[in-house]
């Protein structure tokens, strides 16, 4: 009996040793560090339909661009058909003195101006950009250029159909901007203003220009409009253009009091010069041009 107990103890001990050895053999594998799975890049956010999320369109008010030339307050309009991919024409417009930047209380005062709104109401869908600058000299001209380039880089803009339109102080600004960077603009509407830029670069790049000034303009006077026309015409001739070619890209209109009276303006012809933005044929003339 004692021998049987001894044999059973030996058998039980051997079994325990065998189990312990198996457990120790399995331990390293169970504790081995498992390599992490490769990170999967997240999918782009899409709308429930599977299409990219829609782009905000309409009027985007009172934005700020911190540029190399300083702070640029601006607003812009994206037509409903803008999708962020299909390039559209763009019009850069600058208002007169009374709608420039004079602090927060003046912010957005350019948005009910006909010179901004008119382009949004045409059959041709266009991006419209307007800044409120603080002067009408070289600083403002370079800010207008910087804003134009910002939109060319960050929005779907047809680079061959970028236009400018300036009234009064805004015209002084944009006449310089167009002369400094004529490669950016296809056509320019110069309304009730004086020309402060050079002529030769505009002609050499073939920028189309429409000059508008009331014959009775009390601030600048029609002589400055004619001087701008003559300077540009001479520059086009010097660049080798024939007169009929010049006529296709350079226009001037200095309407008289009767013309203005037909449009409800009987005084303050400088301020009344804003009616040019109601002349659809002039706006469409601007938009008909592409960069050469």
Named regions from a protein language model:
Residues 7-19:
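Bacterial N-terminal signal peptides
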Residues 22-88, 172, 176-177, 237-249:
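A domain-start/cap signature at the N-terminus of enzymes
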Residues 81-86, 136-168:
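Gly/Ser-rich "nucleophile elbow"/oxyanion-hole loop immediately N-terminal to the catalytic nucleophile
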Residues 90, 94-145:
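Active-site machinery of serine-nucleophile hydrolases
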Residues 106-107, 220-238:
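Short alpha-helix in the alpha/beta-hydrolase fold that links the catalytic acid
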Residues 124, 203-209:
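Short, proline-enriched alpha-helix->beta-strand connector loops that line the catalytic pocket
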Residues 153-154, 160-204:
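Primarily recognizes the serine-hydrolase "nucleophile elbow" in alpha/beta-hydrolase
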Residues 212, 216-218, 236-292:
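C-terminal catalytic histidine-bearing segment of alpha/beta-hydrolase fold enzymes
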């Amino acid at each position: 009996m004692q021998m049987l107990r001894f044999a059973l103890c030996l058998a039980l001990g051997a079994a325990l040793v065998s189990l312990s050895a198996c457990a120790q053999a399995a331990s390293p594998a169970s504790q081995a560090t498992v390599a992490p799975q490769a990170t999967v890049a997240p999918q782009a956010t899409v709308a429930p339909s599977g299409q990219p999320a829609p782009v905000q369109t309409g009027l985007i008010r009172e934005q700020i661009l911190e540029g190399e030339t300083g702070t640029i307050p601006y607003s812009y309009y994206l037509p409903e058909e803008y999708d962020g991919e299909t390039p559209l024409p763009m019009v850069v417009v600058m208002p007169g003195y009374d709608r420039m930047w004079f602090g927060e209380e003046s912010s957005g005062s350019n948005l009910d101006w006909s010179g901004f709104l008119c382009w949004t109401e045409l059959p041709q869908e266009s991006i419209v950009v307007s800044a409120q600058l603080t002067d009408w000299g070289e600083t403002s001209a370079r800010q207008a250029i910087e804003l134009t380039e910002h939109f060319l880089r960050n929005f779907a803009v047809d680079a061959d159909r970028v236009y400018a339109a300036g009234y009064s102080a805004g015209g002084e600004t944009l006449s310089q901007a167009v002369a400094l960077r004529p490669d950016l603009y296809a056509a320019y509407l110069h309304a009730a203003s004086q020309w402060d830029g050079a002529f030769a670069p505009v002609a050499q790049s073939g920028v189309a220009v429409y000059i508008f000034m009331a014959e009775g303009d009390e601030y600048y006077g029609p002589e400055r409009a004619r001087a701008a026309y003559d300077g540009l015409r001479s520059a086009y001739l010097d660049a080798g253009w024939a007169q009929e070619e010049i006529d296709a890209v350079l226009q001037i209109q200095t309407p008289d009091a009767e013309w203005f009276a037909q449009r409800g303006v009987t005084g303050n012809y400088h301020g009344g010069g804003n009616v040019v933005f109601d002349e659809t044929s002039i706006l469409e003339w601007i938009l008909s041009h592409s960069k050469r």
